[in-house]
Amino acid sequence: MLACFPCFLRRKMPCLLKVADAGCSVGLGKVHCSCHLPNPRVLRHCDILTGVLTLGLDMSCHACLSAGTGLGEELVGLGPGSTCLVKHLWLLFPCHRLASQNYSDSLAQQWSFSLLIMWLCNREREIFMSKCAKCI
C-alpha cells in the first residue's frame, strides 16, 4: 500500500526523488542530483524535518526542456523556484509494502505525481487525504 500523506509526514526514512529515464536519484539530505542533466539543480531545496521538496529547473536553460533529458514539458507551479517539470518526476516511498502488494509502475507513478503536485501547488491537505482515505 502506498504511503498516505500523514505517513509521509511521519516517515522514519528519507524518501528519494528520482528523475525517470535520467538515471538520477537524490536523497533528501543532498542538494544536487547525480545525473548528467544540463542543469543539475533538479532539487532546489529540501527540508529534512518536514520532507517538503522544492523542485525546479532553470527555465532559461532550453536544453532542460529537450526530450533527451527524459523530462516532460508539463509545468506545475507559480513561478521561478516553485515551477517544476512533473510529467516524469517520481517520488519513491521507502515502504516495503509497495512491492509486496504488487502495485504496477503506472499506478505508483500516478499516486507519486499526485503527491508531488499537492506539495508544489500548496493545495489543502484534505484534497490529497480524500484521495488517500483507504490508506489511513
Swiss-Prot record:
UniProt note on tissues of expression: Widely expressed.
Protein name: Putative uncharacterized protein encoded by ERC2-IT1
Organism: Homo sapiens (Human)
Gene expressing this chain: ERC2-IT1
